[in-house]
Amino acid sequence: NLYQFKNMIHCTVPSRPWWHFADYGCYCGRGGKGTPVDDLDRCCQVHDNCYEKAGKMGCWPYFTLYKYKCSQGKLTCSGGNSKCGAAVCNCDLVAANCFAGARYIDANYNINFKKRCQ
């Protein structure tokens, strides 16, 4: 769920507050549209697509609880998750790891969505 995703982000990117990822580019935060502005925004586009796929499996990604572990910046999804829990955990884990490897460009935070995301 979104609370767990926030905690996963904190695990892989402890140096930056999670809310910096909630209004970034064209895909991080609100619904996505247009061309991603950079690699970090592409992480969010992939995450959106992953949640969409989980939704088509009958899951509710924003609310699905799952079990995971964070140890020294490394995430693992627990083996005992339900089908939906495993799917959503994997979506969030992949995104949090992607965030850790992508450059954060301050100019792409809180952009003019209507102008830049067509």
UniProtKB/Swiss-Prot annotation:
Q: Name one Pfam family in it.
A: Phospholip_A2_1
Lipid metabolism among keywords: yes
Q: Which reaction does it catalyse?
A: a 1,2-diacyl-sn-glycero-3-phosphocholine + H2O = a 1-acyl-sn-glycero-3-phosphocholine + a fatty acid + H(+)
Query: Residues in the active site?
Result: 47, 92
GO term, biological process aspect, one: phospholipid metabolic process
Which residues does Ca(2+) bind? 27, 29, 31, 48
Cofactor note from UniProt? Binds 1 Ca(2+) ion.
Please give the name of this protein.
Answer: Basic phospholipase A2 CM-III
